[in-house]
Amino acid sequence: MPSKRSLPAALKMARKARGLSQEAFSDVSSRTYLSTLERGMKSPTLNKLAAISRVLTIHPMTLLMLSYTGGNNAEIDALTARIRREISALKL
């Protein structure tokens, strides 16, 4: 079973929180492919992650944030602040 802090766990957590079955993603992915993602057997491309996120009606970064924080609010705040600092330091 994947750790609570992983993309497979975040996918499953978000899907269940939305009350969706794996079959609900049939327009963007097969049930078997989604199952392999949730079990950590494959990694999605950014395009596939975006398509899955659209079905979940969340931003792809939300899934990534859940992947790194497990949904812990303090960790979400800390990671958001870090990302803001790092982007600012790039001086784009």
What are these regions (language model features)?
Residues 1-17:
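A short, Lys/Arg-rich alpha-helix, primarily the initiator
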Residues 18-39:
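Short alpha-helical DNA-recognition segment
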Residues 10, 19-21, 45-48, 59:
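Residues that mark the N-terminal boundary/hinge immediately upstream of a DNA-recognition element
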Residues 65-92:
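Short, charged recognition helix plus adjacent turn
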Residues 41-54:
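Short, basic-rich loop-to-helix N-cap that marks the start of a DNA-contacting helix
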